[in-house]
Amino acid sequence: MASLLRPTPLLSTPRKLTHSHLHTSISFPFQISTQRKPQKHLLNLCRSTPTPSQQKASQRKRTRYRKQYPGENIGITEEMRFVAMRLRNVNGKKLDLSEDKTDTEKEEEEEEEDDDDDDEVKEETWKPSKEGFLKYLVDSKLVFDTIERIVDESENVSYAYFRRTGLERCESIEKDLQWLREQDLVIPEPSNVGVSYAKYLEEQAGESAPLFLSHFYSIYFSHIAGGQVLVRQVSEKLLEGKELEFNRWEGDAQDLLKGVREKLNVLGEHWSRDEKNKCLKETAKAFKYMGQIVRLIIL
């Protein structure tokens, strides 16, 4: 009973946990930071759809300019002249593909080539005949008559600019043929070469003014640049140096040709690049036909 009556010991009052006690009694293996770590944000500048300014810049980068044809910056007749010179050099085996030479050097070389050509003639590398020269004059008359008649009679406005240029040769050649008849020489009929070329000129005149005019200019250019020299040399050999009407103009031939050249260049400004390229091909054909007619002199 005594044990039962023994007073039960009072439980000790629990200690009040203060903030400091709580802090020391609770621990973690790591620290929790309430501050966020700074993050690096990258701006994605690549857009799936380009802006208008970016599109324009991209288009400018892709623009490629084609290489100009020789003489294109001056006019279509200058392009034709380059074709003629290239044909002349190839046929004479004097082709030079170098583009690094100055204009002065090229002019000096051209003058040297002209001197070489004169030397070749003086050395009698070819022997003309009266019969062949008559064929040449007859075919030349047919060709000049064809182009002059076309520009006079055609209703094409482009051809009207080339009427009465002062370069006309048909009547002049007819006077020479009449004089040769008086020398008891028989005037032949036009050869197949002249007839074929005249027919071709008629076809081109009906199909395309630019193509026909490339022949028109090339024919006069050919005679003034080299044909008249050839006629004079043949006359010295066969006709005692008589000055033929074929080589006489009322005015300076170069000035007259310049007038035609300027008109053709103005028209050429309205032609497409494709039309101009076709004109250059026709220029080569024109010199091919004229070369065949010249060769009649020695056949």
UniProtKB/Swiss-Prot annotation:
CDD domains: HemeO. Residues 1-83 form a transit peptide. Keywords: Chloroplast, Photosynthesis, Plastid, Transit peptide. Residues 46-57 have a biased composition (Polar residues). Residues 1-20, 45-70, 96-126 are annotated as: Disordered. GO terms for molecular function: heme oxygenase (decyclizing) activity. Residues 105-122 have a biased composition (Acidic residues). SUPFAM superfamilies: Heme oxygenase-like. Widely expressed at low levels. GO terms for cellular component: chloroplast. It is found in: Plastid, Chloroplast. Belongs to the heme oxygenase family. Probable inactive heme oxygenase. Binds protoporphyrin IX, a precursor for both heme and chlorophyll biosynthesis. Plays a minor role in phytochrome assembly and photomorphogenesis. This is Probable inactive heme oxygenase 2, chloroplastic. The gene is HO2.
